[in-house]
């Protein structure tokens, strides 16, 4: 039973640049009627999935949003609607990394509701397991599945390095800022997560939280918590190593420990401890504070973000078309569906993730992805978690 | 050795036939053992990619040494704990006038049906501040139960759910105990305690050691319990490196784990060899007389009840407590289907069947072989049992994809994985059964003109049947619980109870995970009852 894979974590790939906020035709979910645009898909072979033909049922945006606590006052999502994408049919084999409590499976079920001829056969396992499996399949020239959907971008990097991916068309992923997709178009981000500093609003105000990570040991360090064994924390340290160097990371880890930072098992616990007043602040992925808010009555917790350094890292879950897909165009159309306004709304409202297309807003009062000052690093390099383990051990942390 | 050796060579058989038969058996056992070791090929290949100086650096750094020490402490403590629980339970249910003996006999074996990761989860969520126990016990004035975690928590949980290995093997030894020796000792003025120490115990030691071996190796390879209890051991180190894309490092640690397993195996072999080697042989039906518990009846019952309460009542009770409660997970509605239960039963049954068939030659050769190498195939089969599931799964994946890719994406690869991981349990029980059958019976059948195969079928097989059933039961139960390798090797659409538990557990919603966990325990429990009642040693 692996606990490290239970959530969004890990990371790699894509160069962060300023995103151009492209507006796509506003498809106000409920009313627009499906027009089959750009039928790229041919008929699939060997029972593979295909696109362009097949039937489509009527659906509502509400079934994508679910009934979570942040749904109430949301603006209509804009972007390409599922109604404007080629219909999907046949069978798609999807390697689905991570659990997310079957949430992504819910998305698949929504798609199967819409397309009666569509079957999605998913094989769900920890992302690391699947990446290693696909890598081995690629070595034996026997990649089985069409699509890899991973909660860990590092896994996507490993798979594309193994030559197991097919290039996505530039058109299909044009709505995603270049920071969140591979330069070679081997994969694309479908949902993002930001590093954040949850703080207790009874103890601190937003201005008390320093704007760079390096200032924390001398300011809030003694009343903070972290979860060093957690994958996302390790990606954060990896980012620090990439921006500065190993020595800086070791020094920072030592300074934080000397300041008296408290260790927790995971970042949900860190966030809960902040809300309970046991900590003034912590290091955690942004969505944990939202989960704490969703399950408690107005807890005193808010999020702060550092500026332009590792503390503001935005990492992604992403999708790749595998060499196992006979019909690349159809598989690409499947990926387009994950980037549709409805699917992005799903990721935002159900998993509290950052949407990857500019037409869909993050939940709550989170800053949009453009407003975050994320560091300019190549996400693929975050897969060097081994080097980070060495650094953390060097700093006396048990990982 | 012993008197029976004189009957070894049956004059009526030409020695060339004997040699040929023993050669066939050796070849068969050897190739089975090699097949079981195939997943290790990948592990060795991965490890060989790391330069030697780096290997030394990894092995000698403080963290590695700490973790070796932690692992040794855990394995030792759980093994001792299991002996302290399992042996008294076996003695009470076999040798005393414990009330409801048959009931306790079955109950004492039942904790095997509960996966240790579920047990660990139950104890963690039950104890400490805000735990379920605190909720339940608050009305009767108990305010707080200390949190069970770390080393203590790991030892308690692993002991509670692995002691049945020791219980079952000790019980089998007790049932074949020669009562006349004890009576002789008593008549020579030895006290009951002294007779136990000088006569009974030496005869029990190999049985206890066989069970303790399984406990030690299980503890060595278990990831879930120490991880949930936050106690740092080898398996967690392997997962950390695996997760950081350092398969080569993970492989080195896996080989180190195998090394530790070999040490344990060697220790157990020594214990067995120092014994006279004949303790197992059942010469007659003279069982030792029943010991009257007298005023110890109360404490004995209290002991049995406490173990049953902690191991069998607490986990299902906690699961029922969570059932239908929402605990702040993020939702997800991947619904439970009964086909998952059927899938689990189906692959686990196949694994049990194949394991028993494959174990027989190894066990027979090890028990009856004359060469000092005869035990090698049997001993080497334990390697798979000591390796964490994810490493074994990747090794199997490599072997399958490169050499037998027709197996890939079938149920067969899962069966193969379970056989590699869990067959040693069947080898162990079968070996003791073979040792218990008197060779003279086979020789007699042979002199009456039966071929060796026919003698085996007519004489040996009926006698080893309890061992076959016990072995099949153990493999079945552990296969039902297997999670790590199953996640890697199953094909799309094929979910077992364990993989479904993983799937819903990751939503952090305990309420959703409670139902499949209860079904897993229920289905395993029922299968266990059927097995126990049908053949295994309940009717003494």
PLM features: residue spans?
Chain B
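Transmembrane alpha-helical segments of polytopic membrane transport and secretion proteins
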Residues: 1-28, 270-305, 530-540
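Peri-membrane helix termini and adjoining interfacial loops of integral membrane proteins
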Residues: 2-8, 44-56, 128-140, 229-235, ...
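Membrane-water interface segments at the C-terminal ends of transmembrane alpha-helices
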Residues: 18-49, 62-174, 203-223, 252-268, ...
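Transmembrane helix boundary and interhelical loop/hinge segments in multi-pass membrane proteins
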Residues: 51, 171-181, 192, 231, ...
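Short amphipathic alpha-helical coupling elements at transmembrane boundaries
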Residues: 53, 57-60, 105, 138, ...
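Juxtamembrane helix-boundary/capping and inter-helix hinge elements in multi-pass membrane proteins
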Residues: 96-100, 175-180, 189-193, 243-247, ...
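Glycine/proline-centered hinge or cleavage motifs at structural transition points of membrane proteins
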Residues: 188-189, 202, 448-449, 462
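Glycine-rich helix-loop "coupling/hinge" segments at transmembrane-helix boundaries
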Residues: 220-247, 483-510
């Amino acid at each position: 039973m692996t606990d490290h894979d239970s959530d969004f974590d890990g990371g790699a790939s894509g160069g962060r640049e300023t995103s151009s906020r492209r507006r796509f035709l506003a498809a106000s979910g409920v009313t627009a009627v499906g027009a089959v645009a750009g039928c790229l898909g041919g008929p699939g072979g060997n029972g593979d999935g295909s696109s362009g033909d097949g039937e489509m049922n009527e659906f509502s945006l509400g079934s994508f949003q679910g009934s979570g606590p942040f749904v109430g006052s949301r603006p209509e999502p804009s972007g390409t609607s599922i109604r404007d994408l080629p219909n999907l049919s046949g069978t798609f084999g999807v390697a689905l990394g991570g659990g997310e409590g079957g949430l992504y499976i819910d998305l698949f079920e929504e798609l199967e509701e819409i397309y009666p001829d569509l079957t999605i056969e998913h094989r769900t396992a920890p992302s690391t397991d699947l990446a290693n499996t696909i890598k081995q399949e690629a070595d034996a020239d026997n990649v089985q599945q069409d699509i890899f959907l991973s909660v860990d971008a590092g896994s996507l990097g490993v798979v594309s390095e193994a030559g197991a991916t097919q290039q996505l068309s530039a058109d299909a992923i044009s709505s995603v800022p270049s920071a969140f997709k591979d330069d070679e178009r081997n994969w694309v981000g479908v949902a993002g997560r930001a590093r954040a500093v949850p703080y207790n609003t009874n103890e601190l105000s937003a201005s008390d939280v320093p704007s760079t990570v390096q200032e924390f040991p001398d300011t809030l360090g003694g009343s903070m918590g972290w979860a060093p064994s957690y994958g996302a924390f390790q990606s954060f340290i990896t980012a620090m190593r990439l921006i500065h160097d190993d020595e800086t990371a070791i020094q920072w880890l030592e300074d934080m420990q000397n300041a008296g930072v408290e260790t927790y098992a995971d970042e949900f616990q860190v966030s809960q401890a902040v809300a309970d007043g046991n900590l003034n602040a912590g290091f955690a992925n942004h969505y944990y504070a939202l989960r704490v808010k969703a399950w408690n009555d107005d807890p005193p917790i808010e999020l702060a973000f550092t500026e332009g350094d590792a503390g503001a890292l935005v990492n992604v879950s992403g999708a790749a078309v595998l060499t196992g897909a006979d019909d690349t165009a159809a598989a690409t159309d499947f990926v387009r569906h994950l980037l549709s306004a409805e699917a992005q709304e799903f990721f935002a409202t159900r998993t509290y993730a950052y949407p990857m297309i500019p037409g869909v807003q993050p939940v709550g009062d989170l800053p949009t992805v453009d407003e975050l000052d994320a560091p300019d690093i190549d996400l693929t390099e975050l897969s060097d978690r081994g080097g980070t383990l060495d650094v953390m051990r060097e700093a006396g942390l048990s990982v | 050795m012993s008197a029976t050796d004189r009957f070894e060579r049956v004059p009526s058989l030409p020695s060339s036939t004997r040699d040929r038969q023993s050669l066939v058996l050796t070849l068969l056992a050897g190739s089975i053992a090699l097949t079981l070791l195939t997943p290790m090929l990948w592990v060795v290949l991965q490890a060989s990619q790391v330069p030697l100086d780096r290997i030394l650096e990894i092995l000698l750094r403080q963290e590695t040494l700490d973790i070796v020490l932690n692992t040794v402490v855990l394995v030792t403590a759980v093994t001792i704990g299991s002996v302290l629980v399992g042996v008294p339970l076996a003695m009470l249910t076999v040798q005393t006038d414990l009330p409801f003996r048959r009931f306790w006999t079955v109950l004492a074996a039942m904790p095997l049906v509960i996966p240790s990761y579920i047990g660990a989860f139950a104890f963690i969520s039950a104890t400490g501040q805000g735990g379920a126990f605190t909720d339940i016990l608050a009305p009767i004035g108990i305010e707080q139960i200390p949190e069970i975690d770390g080393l203590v928590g790991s030892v308690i949980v692993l002991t509670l759910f692995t002691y049945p290995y020791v219980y079952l093997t000790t019980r089998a030894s007790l049932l074949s105990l020669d009562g006349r020796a004890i009576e002789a000792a008593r008549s020579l003025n030895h006290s009951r305690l002294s007779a136990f120490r000088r006569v009974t115990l030496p005869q029990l030691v190999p049985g206890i050691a066989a069970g303790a071996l399984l406990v030690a190796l299980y503890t060595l390879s278990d990831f879930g319990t120490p991880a949930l209890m936050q106690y740092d051991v080898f398996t967690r180190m392997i997962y950390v490196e695996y997760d950081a894309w350092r398969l080569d490092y993970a492989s080195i640690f896996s080989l180190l784990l195998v090394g530790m397993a070999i040490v344990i195996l060697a220790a157990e072999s020594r214990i067995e060899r120092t014994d006279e080697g004949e303790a197992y042989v059942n010469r007659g039906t003279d069982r030792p007389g029943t010991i009257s518990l007298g005023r110890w009846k109360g404490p004995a019952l209290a002991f049995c009840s406490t173990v049953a309460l902690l191991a069998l009542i607490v986990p299902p009770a906690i699961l029922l407590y969570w059932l239908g409660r929402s605990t702040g997970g993020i939702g997800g509605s991947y619904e439970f289907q009964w086909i998952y239960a059927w899938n689990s039963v189906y692959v686990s049954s196949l694994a049990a069947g194949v394991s028993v068939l494959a174990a027989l030659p190894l066990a027979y050769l090890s028990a009856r072989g004359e060469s000092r190498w005869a035990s090698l195939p049997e001993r080497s089969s334990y390697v798979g049992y000591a390796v964490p599931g994810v490493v074994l799964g990747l090794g199997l994946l490599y072997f399958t994809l490169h050499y037998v890719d027709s197996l890939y994406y079938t149920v067969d690869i899962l069966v193969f994985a379970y056989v590699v991981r869990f067959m040693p349990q069947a080898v162990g029980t079968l070996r003791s059964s073979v040792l218990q059958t008197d060779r003279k019976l086979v020789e007699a059948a042979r002199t009456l003109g039966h071929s060796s195969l026919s003698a085996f079928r007519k004489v040996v097989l009926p006698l080893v049947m309890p061992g076959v059933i016990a072995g099949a039961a153990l493999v079945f139960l552990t296969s039902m619980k297997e999670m790590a390798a199953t996640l890697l090797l199953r094909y799309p659409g094929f979910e077992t109870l364990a993989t479904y538990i993983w799937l819903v557990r990751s939503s952090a919603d305990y309420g959703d995970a409670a139902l499949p966990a209860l079904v897993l325990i229920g289905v395993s429990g029922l299968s266990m009852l059927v097995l126990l009642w049908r053949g295994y040693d309940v009717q003494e």
